Amino acid sequence: MKPCETVSQLSTVAINGWDLQKALRLLHSSNPTLFEWNNSPIVYKTTPEWAEISSIIGHFFQKKAGLYHYLSTAKKNYREYLKGDMVKLKKYFYVLRPILACRWILEKQTPPPMLFSTLAEACLDEALVPAVTDL
């Protein structure tokens, strides 16, 4: 029987993780979620081994895989969240963030940052920054 590749625990705090074998397989295929986890500004626990992997992870980033992932996410979220009459404000960000991530990848050729504010400052047209910030 194949061991579980994903660690999940639901309680007051949501804990998620992958075993090393799965993480390395996802890294090899340039899975954007792994890059997001690596770029997260919030780290509760790490290890020296992960610090080593983290230092080279950017070399495995494939622009095409990242663009496909974020564009697909934006399209899916648009169809799912923005087609109704009443749209919750935060749902716009579910479409805007992956679009900005695509722009980041095209301009910088690196995985996009996790923080929306960093993406917005770097990728939004200057005239749009105040409007999005006000949201």
What are the functions of these language-model segments?
Residues 54-135:
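Conserved nucleotidyltransferase catalytic core and NTase-mimicking acidic/glycine-rich helix/loop elements
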